[in-house]
Regions:
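Conserved core of the sugar-phosphate nucleotidyltransferase
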Residues: 104-201
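Residue-level signal for inorganic ion chemistry
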Residues: 15, 24, 81, 99, ...
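Short phosphate-binding loop-to-helix
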Residues: 57-93
Length: 204
């Protein structure tokens, strides 16, 4: 549901053409091709729904079933997408969350995140963190006296996957209690703030 303001474009970033194809279509094709994906929902900026449907027809994205409006933040947009699925999917169904602006959907990563979510109830793609992380000294923000060993860090991104029942509960709970929904919060950080244990899947 992002608008691409950081990229200085009038057109939303996911609709920018790359080799005569919008970025969002490259993303959707990764899900369209995957045999374990049954249906696709896109949370989209108002005014671009018809454009997305037209592109989906043009590029044969037959698994696209729902296009709904986003919110003012990323978390509001995901919430809208989750709530729209109430009554449409079962509690044990696996919901994969992915950023439309990330077009390189690796099939093996998608397979692993789905498999781990089926076993554990959730899964987040992860990679080892190779940079050095230092903690800012609260007494002098230009200095540091502490670092975090990178061996205990993981860098996570999308796709992420959750069983729908838990995901739906989490978004109701988070927005009612205003937990894990502000700033740079995402589904994974929200889940941790709600006390859930997350499971790592393979990244790329």
């Amino acid at each position: 549901g992002g608008s691409g303001q950081r990229m200085g474009q009038d057109i939303p970033k996911q609709f920018i053409n790359v080799y005569d194809k919008p970025v969002i279509i490259y993303t959707l094709e990764g899900f369209q091709r995957h045999p374990q994906i049954d249906a696709i929902e896109v949370v989209c900026i108002d005014g671009w729904h018809d454009v997305l449907w037209a592109y989906a027809h043009q590029f044969n994205i037959t698994k696209l079933k729902w296009v709904i409006s986003g919110g003012n933040t990323g978390q509001e947009s995901i919430r809208n997408g989750v709530f729209n699925l109430e009554g449409k999917v079962g509690d044990e169904d696996i919901i994969v969350i992915h950023d439309g602006i990330r077009p390189l959907v690796d099939e093996t990563v998608l397979t692993d995140v789905i498999m781990k979510a089926q076993i554990h109830g959730n899964a987040v793609t992860s990679l080892p963190y190779n940079e050095q992380i230092f903690v800012v000294n609260p007494e002098n923000e230009k200095t540091t006296k502490q670092y975090i060993p990178r061996e205990i860090l993981r860098r996570v991104s999308t796709p992420q996957a959750y069983k729908f029942g838990k995901l739906d509960w989490a978004y109701h709970e988070a927005f009612e209690k205003e937990v894990g929904i502000k700033g740079s919060a995402y589904t994974n950080t929200m889940m941790v703030e709600l006390g859930e244990t997350l499971y790592f899947a393979a990244g790329s």
